[in-house]
């Protein structure tokens, strides 16, 4: 993909996501729109601009209902036939029941995908599907990891959490089985972890989901850790 049109909501997270694309993408960015958050759910004007600009791809960050509406309107505009959609936090187990087959074939990036092959993750996904009848989202996976991380510190300290420095030290060891596989902290306490390319597909039972097709970045560190005074 040699050219992209970027879109996201006009608030801190949206600005950060698009800044990350600008910092790392090697092709041409031929347009960018920040839309009003959270009020704007009509993207027809922006989609018309994209059609006129003729990029080779669209990159979006629209969590929740906004992602649902964007995917529907992208398809309704006909751009889904000519301009591929790339996304983060916009197509997932929570939004796919509403986006349905309109999202098929779209690509995204995430630090956790439900088909990651480690045993802890296999058991988590199987148990979740058995109980709820749907795939878990990465919000659920991150929450599970957070619980297991805190539990590992509590167990190491035999339940005595009165000394916060000791609690922090145990948490930083990350001595637990993460759903993401290998998990560790950088010097600035941000995770060092892989990011994966995910494709929206149907599973063998016809349920919409995402699957891993490649590792985008291995042992990724956040871009600013060297500037952090924490060493």
Give residue spans per PLM region.
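Extracellular/periplasmic Venus flytrap/periplasmic-binding protein
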Residues: 1-76, 114-123
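Catalytic-loop motifs flanking and including active-site residues across diverse enzymes
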Residues: 17, 66, 142-146, 193, ...
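Extracellular/periplasmic periplasmic-binding protein-like sensory domains
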Residues: 71-144, 155-161, 204, 210-230
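Solvent-exposed, acidic/polar segments of extracytosolic/periplasmic ligand-binding ectodomains
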Residues: 172-231
């Amino acid at each position: 993909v040699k050219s992209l049109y970027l879109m996201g909501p006009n608030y801190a997270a949206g600005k950060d996501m698009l800044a990350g694309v600008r910092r790392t993408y090697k092709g041409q960015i031929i347009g960018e729109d920040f839309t009003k958050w959270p009020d704007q759910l009509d993207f027809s004007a922006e989609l018309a601009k994209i059609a006129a600009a003729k990029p080779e791809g669209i990159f979006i960050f629209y969590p929740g209902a906004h992602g649902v509406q964007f995917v529907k309107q992208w398809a309704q505009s006909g751009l889904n036939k000519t301009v591929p959609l790339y996304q983060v936090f916009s197509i997932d187990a929570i939004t796919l029941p509403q986006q349905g087959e309109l999202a098929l074939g779209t690509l995204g990036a995430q630090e956790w995908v439900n088909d990651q092959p480690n045993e802890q993750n296999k058991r988590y996904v199987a148990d979740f599907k058995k109980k709820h009848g749907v795939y878990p989202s990465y919000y659920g996976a991150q929450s599970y990891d957070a619980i297991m991380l805190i539990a590992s510190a509590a167990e190491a300290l035999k339940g005595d959490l009165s000394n916060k420095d000791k609690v922090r030290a145990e948490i930083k060891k990350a001595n637990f089985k993460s759903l993401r596989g290998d998990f560790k902290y950088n010097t600035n306490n941000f995770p060092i972890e892989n990011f994966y390319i995910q494709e929206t597909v149907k599973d063998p039972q016809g349920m919409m989901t995402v699957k891993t097709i490649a590792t985008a970045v291995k042992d990724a560190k956040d871009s600013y850790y060297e500037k952090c005074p924490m060493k």
